[in-house]
């Protein structure tokens, strides 16, 4: 049961407050006997509401404004004016703003840190409505939940997505060519596919399980790669090649290893790249193997590490014909593994002499 009085009390009610006046001690003569009879329950109800209003007025006074809730007009107008000012102040706040946490408190758990608060029951509530346990729940050891990703992490993720998109674009522009004759060079292979579009890169690889080889050809656009599929079945050397869309991109070569001069390009023509070499095989074993089948070896570099189960080698022959003959050794077992031989993209440069340490 709520009775709203007119005048100043009604003005305060319009401003958002509900003002209840207690019944007069002696009812006016215009009231009926039914109106004058107020039960003790109603009086108790009015008394409780008055206590709430007095408590509300005390809280309002604490935030810096004194409101006189009296029967005078000034008190109601003052309350209404203060409420308008308070509403104007609240309207200027940004509801999307995040809570500022000083660096000294950012590493500590506690009330209000990381945009949440602890209840008396020990539960931790975030501003987004998610609840966890007071000791951190699914969060970190500091009692807070995982922080938002930093700008650096977001930038790295963006770079990773960009890199992945670029890689997928390269794959769509690349074709896979199989059943390549051992005598076919990369120049001859690129010359066949140049009619389909501009060739960006051409890479021939050895197959240890076959005397034939395979290759990857990258074009400047997808149209070139699509046109290249029509060349499947074309005779190149002594075998018809198979052309399929590639599932991988050509692995880039470190540009610092590429030939820099005409002499180094001539060295590449005499050099082969050998992979899948048994770790028990020594450098002398590799040299003896290729000299027995192909010709004199001028320089050899055997490389390996503890992370890979096999090793690789760059073998430079005295004659370019020996390097071509070495391509036929792909698939031959050396030690306990079949080796893979392909033309080298890089020359075997002599090691620079080390300066003595003083």
Swiss-Prot record:
Q: Where is this motif: PAM2-like?
A: 92-102
Which residue ranges does the UniProt annotation give for the motif Bipartite nuclear localization signal?
A: 146-157
Keyword DNA-binding attributed:
no
What SMART domains does the record point to? RRM
Q: Which UniProt keywords apply?
A: Nucleus, Repeat, RNA-binding
* Molecular function, one GO term: RNA binding
Please indicate if the UniProt record lists Transmembrane helix as a keyword. no
> What do the Gene Ontology cellular component annotations say?
nucleus
Q: Which PROSITE patterns match?
A: RRM
**What InterPro entries does its record include?**
CID8-like_RRM1 (IPR034823), CID8-like_RRM2 (IPR034825), Nucleotide-bd_a/b_plait_sf (IPR012677), PAM2_motif (IPR009818), RBD_domain_sf (IPR035979), RRM_dom (IPR000504)
The lineage's top-level taxon is: Eukaryota
Q: Where is the composition biased (Low complexity)?
A: 1-19
What residues does the RRM domain cover?
173-248, 270-346
Could you tell me where this protein is found in the cell? Nucleus
Where is the region Disordered? 1-45, 136-164
Q: Where is the composition biased (Polar residues)?
A: 31-41
Tissue expression: Expressed in cauline leaves, stems, immature siliques and primary inflorescences.
List all Basic residues biased stretches. 145-159
Q: What is known of its domains?
A: Contains a PAM2-like motif, which seems to be involved in the binding to the PABC/CTC domain of PAB proteins.
Protein name listed in UniProt: Polyadenylate-binding protein-interacting protein 11
Q: From which source organism is this entry?
A: Arabidopsis thaliana
